[in-house]
Amino acid sequence: MPHEPKGLNEECGVFGVWGNPNAASITHLGLHTLQHRGQEGAGIVGLTKDGMRRHYGLGLLSEVFTNTDQLTPLIGRAALGHVRYSTAGGRVLENIQPLLFRFSDEAIALAHNGNLTNAISLRRQLEDQGAIFQSTSDTEVLMHLIRRQVGQPWLTQLKTALNEVHGGFAFVLLTEHGLYAAVDPHGFRPMVVG
């Protein structure tokens, strides 16, 4: 059958590193250990001296990163990686994470495992208010909710947005100032921090 999975599929895998000059390489290795959680696509965002850089694509991690030279542009003190198994949104390049958002005041990378059960209604509400979405993934909804809080301290923006989403989720966000992790109130999605 043409669309049968080749093996074990779970959800997604998310891996982040902060404060290590080999962050992109460590993230790449970490994603190898999580490959069983997602085989549709992979990506890494590196926080470099020149800002955030991203390499991503459809397929297995080994198909997206065919040689270690592809990690060179991502070298910096922090990185965020993701292997995708879609539960919301299509199997298209625009949905491969981490999603990278560049704003006039900052850049934010966002990776997510789980499902937002109110994503459709939130997306409609945000679109009615003028939001423009670049993907069909429910992940992008969180960033639009965060950016509605501009002017508030970063953690207030993040907490306010997280209080608006429902479902089982684990989010990791990378900014120039830190790596932030959040899980749903019931802890349905696995998250290890340390």
Swiss-Prot record:
The active site is at C12 (nucleophile). The keyword Calcium does not apply. The keyword Ligase does not apply. GO terms for biological process: 'de novo' IMP biosynthetic process. It comes from the Bacteria. InterPro entries: GATase_2_dom, Ntn_hydrolases_N. Pathway: Purine metabolism; IMP biosynthesis via de novo pathway; N(1)-(5-phospho-D-ribosyl)glycinamide from 5-phospho-alpha-D-ribose 1-diphosphate: step 1/2. Keywords: Glutamine amidotransferase, Glycosyltransferase, Purine biosynthesis, Transferase. Residues 1-11 form a propeptide. Its EC number is 2.4.2.14. One of its GO terms (molecular function) is amidophosphoribosyltransferase activity. It catalyses: 5-phospho-beta-D-ribosylamine + L-glutamate + diphosphate = 5-phospho-alpha-D-ribose 1-diphosphate + L-glutamine + H2O. Residues 12-194 form the Glutamine amidotransferase type-2 domain. Catalyzes the formation of phosphoribosylamine from phosphoribosylpyrophosphate (PRPP) and glutamine. In the C-terminal section; belongs to the purine/pyrimidine phosphoribosyltransferase family. This is Amidophosphoribosyltransferase.
